[in-house]
Swiss-Prot record:
SUPFAM superfamilies: Alpha-L RNA-binding motif. One of the primary rRNA binding proteins, it binds directly to 16S rRNA where it nucleates assembly of the body of the 30S subunit. It comes from Liriodendron tulipifera (Tuliptree). Its main location: plastid. This is Small ribosomal subunit protein uS4c. The lineage of its organism: Eukaryota, Viridiplantae, Streptophyta, Embryophyta, Tracheophyta.
Length: 201
């Protein structure tokens, strides 16, 4: 299944706010999550919608998300918590959380077009897994810095997650630690996502 490139507002009406996909918010009364034909959502549909919310927020294909779920399932600790940590530590998401891009698709473009360096080296893989003490910067070219500055100027100045530090004058971000679950940038019940996949096997 390919990555979603359709109307974004349609998705947030169905699933609620998806800040990684779009900065838009559903209008009051336009949220379709509780408006099913039967008047009551099944447990399957609730789990499916949580899975879709995670997938569209982080801009993943179905295959990519399934791979992350499998990796998380083999790791120590809560599968749901490990899954969120894996997704949050992706380079495209780190750029988004730093405010260097207004959306995760926008961050992905910056990476694909080789505007981003990690520890002084160009990284053009959006799924690159960042680690504590990684330093995220832009290339020294004027065009690269202009793109980042445009994002910084247009993005709402929200409180930065505690696992990150950003020096806007230097276009430099620092990953301080693995993210704590309370700083996840999405309202999600990750256990329902894990349950969804466990029932598919």
């Amino acid at each position: 299944m390919s990555r979603y490139r359709g109307p974004r507002f349609k998705k947030i009406r169905r699933l609620g706010a998806l800040p990684g996909l779009t900065s838009k918010r559903p209008r009051p009364g336009s949220d379709l999550r509780n408006q099913s034909r039967s008047g009551k959502r099944s447990q399957y549909r609730i789990r499916l919608e949580e899975k879709q919310k995670l997938r569209f927020h982080y801009g993943l294909t179905e295959r990519q998300l399934l791979r992350y779920v499998r990796i998380a399932g083999k790791a120590k600790g809560s599968t749901g918590q490990v899954l969120l940590q894996l997704l949050e530590m992706r380079l495209d998401n780190i750029l988004f959380r730093l405010g260097m891009a207004s959306t995760i698709p926008g961050a992905r473009q910056l990476v694909n077009h080789r505007h981003i360096l990690v520890n002084g080296r160009i990284v053009d893989i959006p799924s690159y897994r960042c680690k504590p003490r990684d330093i995220i910067t832009t290339r020294g070219e004027q065009r690269s810095r202009a793109l980042i500055q445009n994002y910084i100027d247009s993005s709402p100045h929200e409180e930065l997650a505690k696992h990150l530090t950003f020096h806007s004058s230097q276009y430099k971000g620092l990953v301080n630690q693995i993210i704590d679950s309370k700083w996840i940038g999405l309202k999600i019940n990750e256990l329902l996502v894990v349950e969804y996949y466990s029932r598919q096997t």
